[in-house]
Amino acid sequence: ADCSATGDTCDHTKKCCDDCYTCRCGTPWGANCRCDYYKARCDT
């Protein structure tokens, strides 16, 4: 799957953080994870 754009919300329908980034905000499909450029940040 293609990566979502920077800032897009990551959920179970968007694999961008798993496929092209490293996203670990509690769970692999962190509800509060957002894609960032080459990284992920947690929105708390």
UniProtKB/Swiss-Prot annotation:
List lipidated residues, O-palmitoyl threonine.
T44
Post-translation: what modifications? Contains 5 disulfide bonds.
Give me the disulphide-bonded residues: C3-C17, C10-C23, C16-C35, C20-C42, C25-C33
- Give expression by tissue: Expressed by the venom gland.
- Does the keyword field hold Secreted? yes
The subcellular localization recorded is: Secreted
- Recall the GO molecular function terms of this protein's record: calcium channel regulator activity; toxin activity
Threonine amide modification sites? T44
Which Gene Ontology CC terms are recorded?
extracellular region; host cell presynaptic membrane
**What are the protein's UniProt keywords?**
Amidation, Calcium channel impairing toxin, Disulfide bond, Ion channel impairing toxin, Knottin, Lipoprotein, Neurotoxin, Palmitate, Presynaptic neurotoxin, Secreted, Toxin, Voltage-gated calcium channel impairing toxin
UniProt lists the family membership as follows: Belongs to the neurotoxin 02 (plectoxin) family. 02 (plectoxin) subfamily.
Role, per record:
Toxin that inhibits presynaptic voltage-gated calcium channel (Cav) in Drosophila nerve terminals, most likely through specific block of the Cav2 channel (known as Dmca1A).
Give the domain section of the comments.
Answer: The presence of a 'disulfide through disulfide knot' structurally defines this protein as a knottin.
Name the record gives this protein: Omega-plectoxin-Pt1a
> Which species expresses this protein natively?
Plectreurys tristis (Spider)
